[in-house]
Amino acid sequence: MRQMVYALQFIGKAVPANEAGTVLNASLSAPQCTITTSNDSGACEGVIRTGAGPQATFESKVTFIGDTAFQEEGTITLSDKGDSIRFSTVGQGYLGTSADPKVKHGCVAWRIDSGKGRFEGATGLITSNFLVTADGEVTDHHFGLIFLK
């Protein structure tokens, strides 16, 4: 199997799917990008530069199972040809407070459950490190390692 690595910054919105607010539907998109990390000045710094071209899309259902714990499942489409992966949470995700009182900070790991197109038969794991505002605005940083058939 061949390995494929991807890193993208998705931006979008999460909205309540029930009255209690314990289920959210997230819809995000990510332009092509270049991510550079350097340690030239002795201080690690990262830069994300967006580029032109087709955008990746992300749709998920988030179900809270506690004050800070959640389960998630969804689809990430990584091409304009419909090549996509279905994923679900490994263990549970975490969403809590951050040093910035305007945003919550969370993380989650997903397993790839299935794929379509070039991702047919794919397996792998994806990590997500994200921020959410009180209005449901989401900035989500993905790093995935996918094994392609």
PLM feature spans:
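Beta-strand-enriched cores of mature, soluble protein domains
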Residues: M1-K149
